């Protein structure tokens, strides 16, 4: 099992690499790539940790060596949000980065599962899909926008609010990965009573705006890196388990049946070839139905911006 992390010298990338070095199955290899010259040193640093995971680091303008033979590719390359920036502000810089890296994925490891972390995820996944399609290697079962951080936040905030063990809270978060497109299905949380619709609305808004909470708290020093790394590691390890035959369910931003939008975050069952089954959303509350319908124009616009970046 070979996992490649592109953008491995950044705040998310280094933390993600550490988590994978500690948690990948014995005999795995971890390949780190970044334009930053420090990247081989990050790999050397990690290589001193005694786990049976081999780490290599590559720097420069070409990620080809890092990608050769990769089974899973995680892309966190690009610029991070700063105070006052929206995820859409990131588009201009990050779109070109995702395009060029995905072109290399298509060349070097066309059958790999690809997880996009770089924001704005709603659009970046569409860019990656169109690049892979142009290269003739697109398999919609194997391309994911990693929205797991929305789930981690929802689990944490629900547990704080209701005095629960956060490791025992499970909740699907659907839609997309920015602002109003993030929709936690609070009505589906087991063994929790909501005191009012106001409580649900307030918690939904907190989950939707949690990224901004971190950006502001870091006071210009970055965005959510450590929690995002944990989210990406959780999703990557789910892919690893699924590749070994386990039946794993996670939410991810994927191309499904197109009922709501071409790409949509929903629960999926993972298998040896990526998505094995697209699961239903279950019963939604009236508030959730309304919020779902209200987000679609924004989500579809985000997707179109990604498609148009490649197709003109």
Swiss-Prot record:
It catalyses: (S)-malate + NAD(+) = oxaloacetate + NADH + H(+). The active site is at residue 177. One of its GO terms (biological process) is tricarboxylic acid cycle. Pfam families: Ldh_1_C, Ldh_1_N. GO terms for molecular function: L-malate dehydrogenase (NAD+) activity. GO terms for cellular component: cytoplasm. It comes from the Bacteria. NAD(+) binds at residues 7-13, 34, 94, 117-119, 228. Its EC number is 1.1.1.37. Substrate binds at residues 81, 87, 119, 153. Keywords: NAD, Oxidoreductase, Tricarboxylic acid cycle. Belongs to the LDH/MDH superfamily. MDH type 1 family. Homodimer. Catalyzes the reversible oxidation of malate to oxaloacetate. HAMAP family: Malate_dehydrog_1. This is Malate dehydrogenase. It comes from Mannheimia succiniciproducens (strain KCTC 0769BP / MBEL55E). The gene is mdh.
């Amino acid at each position: 099992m070979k996992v490649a992390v592109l953008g491995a010298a950044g705040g998310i990338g280094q933390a993600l690499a550490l988590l994978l070095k500690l948690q990948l199955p014995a005999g795995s290899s971890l390949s780190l790539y970044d334009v930053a010259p420090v990247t081989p040193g990050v790999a050397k640093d990690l290589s001193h940790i005694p786990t049976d995971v081999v780490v290599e680091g590559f720097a420069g303008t070409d990620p080809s060596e890092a990608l050769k033979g990769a089974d899973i590719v995680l892309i966190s390359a690009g610029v991070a949000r700063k105070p006052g920036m929206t995820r859409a502000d990131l588009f201009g810089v990050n779109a070109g980065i995702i395009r060029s890296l995905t072109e290399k994925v298509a060349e070097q490891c066309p059958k790999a599962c690809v997880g996009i972390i770089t924001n704005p995820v709603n659009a970046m996944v569409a860019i990656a899909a169109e690049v892979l399609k142009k290269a003739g290697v697109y398999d919609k079962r194997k391309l994911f926008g990693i929205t797991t951080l929305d789930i981690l936040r929802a689990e944490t905030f629900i547990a704080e609010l209701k005095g629960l063990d956060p490791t025992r809270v499970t909740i699907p978060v659907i839609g997309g990965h920015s602002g109003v497109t993030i929709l936690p299905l609070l009505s589906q949380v087991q063994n929790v009573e909501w005191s009012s619709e106001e409580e649900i609305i307030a918690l939904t808004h907190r989950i939707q705006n949690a990224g901004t909470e971190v950006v502001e708290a870091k006071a210009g020093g970055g965005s959510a890196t450590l929690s995002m790394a944990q989210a990406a590691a959780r999703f990557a390890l789910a892919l690893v388990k699924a590749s070994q035959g386990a039946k794993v369910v996670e939410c991810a931003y994927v191309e499904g049946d197109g009922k709501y939008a071409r790409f949509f975050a929903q629960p999926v069952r993972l298998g040896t070839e990526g998505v094995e089954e697209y699961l239903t959303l279950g019963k939604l509350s009236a508030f959730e139905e309304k919020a779902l319908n209200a987000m679609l124009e924004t989500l579809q616009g985000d997707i179109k911006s990604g498609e148009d970046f490649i197709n003109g």
